[in-house]
Amino acid sequence: MLKLRQLQKEKQRQAAQAQAPAQGRSAASPAQLRVEKDLATLELPTTVTLDTKCLGSENKVYLRISPEEGVYRGGHFRFSVVFRDTYPIEPPTVKCLNTIYHPNIDYSGNICLNVLREDWSPVMDLQTVVLGLLFLFLEPNGSDPLNRQAADTMLRDPYRFETNVQATMMGGHLDGQVFDNVRH
């Protein structure tokens, strides 16, 4: 009988040791699982690159958008995309990391894009975000601006707007604001 108890205790100890490493690892959250799914199905156009080096530690990815047409052609614009624990119920937080002259992006990098606000739905994904950002560079929206000055110029004087965009993409100043060189 004593030997039977020793065998039983030994099996329990072995089972506990086998479970210990599994318990030490944290299970992926629903948000992390969804991000992994989004990345697996993501189809990036040639004008967009993705950097996932901070995905595990910060739930963040970086995008680089390089439009080949429109007034922003020739620029390279970096964005951070942060996935909170509430993703996909709530949209990711997206910031432009360059100071640029754009009606829908303010100088702090905040972005006015409906799919990142009131039009977001849990069926949307990272692909939706990428396409929305691309669309902002191809068709800036002057009727729903974060940068009212850029929007007013775009609506009143499209030629001056394009001139301002091209000048600010090379860095420098416009109306007291310093812009990043996004041409390199």
From Swiss-Prot:
<feature type="active site" description="Glycyl thioester intermediate">
    <location>
        <position position="112"/>
    </location>
</feature>
<comment type="pathway">
    <text>Protein modification; protein neddylation.</text>
</comment>
<comment type="similarity">
    <text>Belongs to the ubiquitin-conjugating enzyme family. UBC12 subfamily.</text>
</comment>
<dbReference type="GO" id="GO:0005829">
    <property type="term" value="C:cytosol"/>
</dbReference>
<feature type="compositionally biased region" description="Low complexity">
    <location>
        <begin position="14"/>
        <end position="29"/>
    </location>
</feature>
<dbReference type="GO" id="GO:0005524">
    <property type="term" value="F:ATP binding"/>
</dbReference>
<keyword id="KW-0067">ATP-binding</keyword>
<dbReference type="InterPro" id="IPR023313">
    <property type="entry name" value="UBQ-conjugating_AS"/>
</dbReference>
<dbReference type="GO" id="GO:0019788">
    <property type="term" value="F:NEDD8 transferase activity"/>
</dbReference>
<feature type="region of interest" description="Disordered">
    <location>
        <begin position="10"/>
        <end position="29"/>
    </location>
</feature>
<keyword id="KW-0808">Transferase</keyword>
<dbReference type="Pfam" id="PF00179">
    <property type="entry name" value="UQ_con"/>
</dbReference>
<dbReference type="GO" id="GO:0061654">
    <property type="term" value="F:NEDD8 conjugating enzyme activity"/>
</dbReference>
<dbReference type="InterPro" id="IPR000608">
    <property type="entry name" value="UBQ-conjugat_E2_core"/>
</dbReference>
<comment type="function">
    <text>Accepts the ubiquitin-like protein NEDD8/RUB1 from the UBA3-ULA1 E1 complex and catalyzes its covalent attachment to other proteins.</text>
</comment>
<dbReference type="GO" id="GO:0005634">
    <property type="term" value="C:nucleus"/>
</dbReference>
<dbReference type="GO" id="GO:0045116">
    <property type="term" value="P:protein neddylation"/>
</dbReference>
<keyword id="KW-0547">Nucleotide-binding</keyword>
<keyword id="KW-0833">Ubl conjugation pathway</keyword>
<feature type="domain" description="UBC core">
    <location>
        <begin position="30"/>
        <end position="174"/>
    </location>
</feature>
<dbReference type="InterPro" id="IPR016135">
    <property type="entry name" value="UBQ-conjugating_enzyme/RWD"/>
</dbReference>
<protein>
    <recommendedName>
        <fullName>NEDD8-conjugating enzyme UBC12</fullName>
        <ecNumber>2.3.2.34</ecNumber>
    </recommendedName>
</protein>
